[in-house]
């Protein structure tokens, strides 16, 4: 099935973002991105069509396979565009945790990593932030999952190692704060961004 695309280039005047707050973003596999405010976007576009894609592949329907892949690509791009646009419109600074996606693509998590679209989302956030005149930072996300965003400790109760990947909620054994795994990481990423900006360190 042939596909035709009509592209129109227009010049628009970028409007500065009216936002005053900063947010941290944790990139993940279960959710493509989790914001320090608690907002999340699921990134399972491929998974939604995996069954239909498998049927088409086994039946050797090449046109159907191409059509499904095109649909997945368009849904991913549209979802990430909407998510990134809303963030940039409302915030004054966006801090993203650095993820070694190139390494994960070579592991058994490759399919989920590619489906999440981290690189695409980061690129969208970066150029949209630049257009809106807001701060965009990428920070080292080491220990952001294990560190309690409330008291700053790395308690024994925090998720660690491969076994910790299954833990979605945990309680800090030091201050008794209950954490959503990804929201906690996003809050720590935001804190790391504040420290970098306060020290005048440039973007990674």
Language-model features, listed with the residues they occupy:
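Positively charged, helix-rich recognition surfaces that bind polyanionic ligands
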Residues: 1-204
């Amino acid at each position: 099935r042939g596909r035709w695309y009509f592209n129109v280039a227009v010049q628009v005047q970028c409007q500065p973002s009216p936002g005053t707050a900063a947010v941290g973003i944790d990139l993940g596999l279960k959710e493509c991105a989790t914001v320090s405010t608690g907002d999340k976007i699921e990134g399972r576009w491929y998974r939604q069509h995996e069954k239909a894609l498998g049927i088409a592949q086994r039946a050797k329907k090449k046109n159907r396979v191409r059509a499904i892949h095109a649909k997945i690509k368009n849904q991913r791009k549209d979802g990430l565009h909407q998510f990134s646009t809303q963030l940039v419109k409302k915030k004054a600074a966006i801090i993203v945790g650095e993820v070694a996606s190139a390494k994960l693509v070579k592991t058994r998590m490759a399919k989920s990593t590619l489906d999440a679209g981290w690189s695409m989302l980061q690129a969208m956030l970066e150029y949209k932030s630049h257009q809106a005149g807001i701060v965009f930072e990428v920070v080292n996300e080491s220990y952001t999952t294990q560190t309690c965003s409330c008291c700053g400790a790395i308690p024994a109760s925090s998720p660690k190692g491969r076994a910790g990947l299954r833990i979605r909620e945990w309680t800090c054994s030091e201050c008794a704060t209950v954490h959503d795994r990804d929201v906690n990481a996003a809050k720590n990423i935001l804190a790391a961004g504040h420290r970098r900006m306060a020290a005048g360190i440039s973007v990674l």
